[in-house]
Amino acid sequence: VTHHIPAGVFFGVKSIIGPGCVVNLEQFFKEIEELEAGGIDVEGNLFIATNTHIITPEHLREDQEDTKIGTTKRGNGPAYRDKYGRRGIRAESVPALAPYLIDIYHELHSNLNAEVLCEGAQGFGLDVDWGDYPYVTSSHCTTAGALLNGIPPQSVRKVYGVAKAYETYVGAKKFEGDEKVFAQIRDVGDEYGATTGRPRQCNWMNISLMKKGANINGVTDLVINKVDVMREVNSWAIRYGDDSSMISRFTIEQDWKDYIQFYFKDVDVVFSESPERI
């Protein structure tokens, strides 16, 4: 799992870390070493926008002392605070990043016919404006956030929403339901935080939140992954909002799928049956 480097490098595609991100230099170079050791050559394919902000050692120290909402302790919050406080450090000011720097405006607007895929790092429920505040991240996890890379709205042709067949959360708030099946889902789905290794709390798919996310983001295609996990535990249910009493249960997988497709009748829905890819 990479934390900074876009997935495009695995496919030999030019990949840019945009200005909506914040970058830990030590982690960035560590990931490059790990990828190259695994046979993935990033040279000529990996870039950082000049106006991307940097996570400093001070940001890390400050975040590790804060225990209020169960963050990943990676310095993201303090880095975004300093960005908006106009006292941050940008990638263009770091000599070690010189080989990776790119003018993202020039790159995008000199290739107007290029196909660009924007990859988000976190889910809609963690968005700083639309998530369960204050149990959120410090950045924008929406289509609007992706446009901050310098992409005009009229250029967007497709918006792919990706969601698990169940819902997960890592952090301080109580999220997991009381049913024993959620521990099963966690084990079968290997639901442990990619950054911290903490066990993720699991719950049934929150279809109301998913619908809200689809509407706000203008989702045209919805991918439901980890269906294979639900199949292994053989439990099919959907909840509505945060009310644990509002749950629809299904005895067979196809009924569950049919209900989701009906609920999102204006969106193309794809169910991912494989842990490898769609």
Language-model-detected regions and their locations in the chain:
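Non-transmembrane, aqueous-exposed alpha-helical and coiled segments at domain scale
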Residues: 1-278
